[in-house]
Amino acid sequence: MELILQLYLLPYNPLRPVICFDERPCFLIGDRIKGLEMKKGEVAKENYAYTKHGSCCVLAAIEPLTGKRFAHIRPQRRRVEFAEFMKDLADLYPDAEKIIVVLDNLNTHNFSSFFHTFDAQTAAKLMDRFEFVFTPKSASWLNMVEIEFSALSRQCLNRRISVSYTHLRAHETAR
């Protein structure tokens, strides 16, 4: 725990940026029956019936000292998605000697994901670019990206999202 707190206290170093990473499931659920219109002074009424449009995974990272945010939406949360996200992250920091990533102990969060996804040479290069710092068990709250997910959930994800993964992905790539 102290190691992560010490990382957050370090001054900004573009050669060794500190990035916080995590992922979150997102369920794509729409209304089957339209709710009642809201009247003045009353709350909106939603019907309990819904339609499922599948699920997806939001992968996100923040750089706390600069405020930079990165996100991907993917249909699943596997080692392939993790490795591809880390490769994209490495591409965003071409001059960095080491990218320090704070993340939890999920089974996909390791260097073997690189070797599973990419050829050995690419995986080895990626492995050299990263230093993983894992949050202690039951202490994922130390990861600052959790604050971002909390805000994102309250503002967007904790409601019915009545679009398909394809539509949501098209919206992500349009930004």
Give the predicted meaning of each segment.
Residues 27-29, 108-111, 141-142:
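Short catalytic/ligand-binding loop motif for oxyanion handling, primarily in non-cytosolic enzymes
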Residues 81-100:
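Short, basic/hydrophobic alpha-helical segments
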Residues 19-21, 100-103, 133-134:
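Short beta-strand segments
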Residues 1-87:
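Extended, low-complexity cationic-aromatic segments
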Residues 104-105, 132-154:
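RNase H-like two-metal-ion nuclease catalytic core shared by retroviral integrases
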Residues 156-165:
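Short, polar/flexible loop-turn hinges at active-site or ligand-entry regions and domain interfaces
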Residues 167-170, 174-175:
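Single conserved hydrophobic/aromatic residue that forms the stacking wall/gate
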Residues 97-109:
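Acidic/histidine-rich, metal-coordinating catalytic segments
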